[in-house]
C-alpha cells in the first residue's frame, strides 16, 4: 500500500507530460501545414528532395498527437505493458530527433552549398513560368534581393539575352521597363543590389544555434517521459504484488 501515493504522483506528472507532448505534436503538425503552404517555394530551392520536409513534419506531428493521447490513456488505465510501449515510443522519438538535430547542425554547410547550386541552376533554366522560376521570383520579391551574389549574375542566364533581368528584381516594378532591364548599367539604379544567397545564408547562420538548441531541448525532454513511464510501470507492478 506504500506505493499508492507514489503512483498517484507519477500518474499526475505523466499525464501533464503527455499533454505537453501532445501539444508539441499539434505544433509540429501546424508548422508542417504552414511550411507547405507558405515556405514551399523556399524549400524547393534548397534541394529537390527537400520538398518532402513539410510532409515529414505533418507525419511526425500526427504520430506524436496519436501517441500523446495513447500516453494519457495508458497512464489513466494504469497498464504496465501500455506504459512500457509508450516509453519505447518516446525512446524512438528521442533517437530520431537527436539524429536529425545533429545531422542538420553538422551538414549545415552542405545545405548552404546545395542552396547555392540549386539557386544558380534555377537561374540558368529560368523562364518566368515554371514552378522553380516562380520560386525564384517569390524569393527575390519577398527578400528584396536579386541574383545569387548580386544582380549581375543574371547576365549569364539565357533568359537575360532575350528578356533582361526579371522584373521580380525591381525595387519598384512599375518603374522598370524591358529596356532598362536589358542594360546592366541602367538596371543598377532600378533593381535590388543585394544577392539572395547572402540573405538566406546569413539568416541560417543567425538562427541555426537557436534552432539546434530548441531541437535538442525537445529531444531530451523525451527522456523525462521515458523515466516517468518506466517508473510508473514498475511501481504499478510492485503495487500489484503488494496486494497479492
Curated annotation (Swiss-Prot):
Glycosylation sites: 49, 150, 153, 172, 183
Family label: Belongs to the tetraspanin (TM4SF) family.
Spans traversing the lipid bilayer: 12-35, 52-70, 82-107, 209-229
Membrane-topology annotation of the record: Multi-pass membrane protein
InterPro entries with a match to the protein in the record: Tetraspanin/Peripherin (IPR018499), Tetraspanin_animals (IPR000301), Tetraspanin_CS (IPR018503), Tetraspanin_EC2_sf (IPR008952), TSN6/7_LEL (IPR048232)
Keyword set, alphabetical order: Glycoprotein, Membrane, Transmembrane, Transmembrane helix
Gene3D superfamilies linked: Tetraspanin
Extracellular-facing ranges: 36-51, 108-208
Any Pfam family: Tetraspanin
Location in or out of the cell: Membrane
GO CC terms of this entry: plasma membrane
Source organism per UniProt: Pan troglodytes (Chimpanzee)
Spans within the Cytoplasmic topological domain: 1-11, 71-81, 230-244
PROSITE patterns in alphabetical order: TM4_1 (PS00421)
Protein name: Tetraspanin-7
Record's function text: May be involved in cell proliferation and cell motility.
Encoding gene per record: TSPAN7
